[in-house]
Amino acid sequence: SVYSGTKGFVLNFSRGLQQELANTGIRIQVVLPAATATDLWDISGVPLAALAPETVMSVEHLVDAALAGFDQGESVTLPSMADIGLWERYDTARSDLFAAMQTGKPAPRLLAL
């Protein structure tokens, strides 16, 4: 839970920096890799060999993909995701949820008690 919470923090922190630095010429990219062949697996007690090999990306491929995403202007790069539209739809839904919460009053379903 600490690992996934940290990833969530890094994503949101990076998004905040992207907004704050939008017109400064400084670009912030956040990379969200899936399983990557690093020592982290063994350190965490889950041997890399326990993962399906086809789901694990090499560090070299991860770095190349992250740099390609940066060169393409991606603010969020998911190195193993072929259909970036999945992320875009998720991100749009996230933004819509945030906007829908800005009503200043309780939702009607919560007042009908």
PLM features per residue range, with description:
Residues S1:
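Cytosolic ligand/metal-binding cores
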Residues N23, A37-P53:
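A glycine/serine/threonine-rich, flexible loop-to-helix segment
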Residues R27-A37:
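Conserved SDR Rossmann-fold cofactor-binding beta-strand/turn motif
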Residues G16-R27:
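Active-site-adjacent segment of SDR/Rossmann-fold oxidoreductases
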Residues A93-L113:
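Non-catalytic terminal and boundary segments that flank Rossmann-like NAD(P)-dependent oxidoreductase
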Residues V30-V31, V46-W87:
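C-terminal helical subdomain
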Residues T6:
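Active-site helix of classical SDR
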Residues V10, S14, V63:
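Short-chain dehydrogenase/reductase
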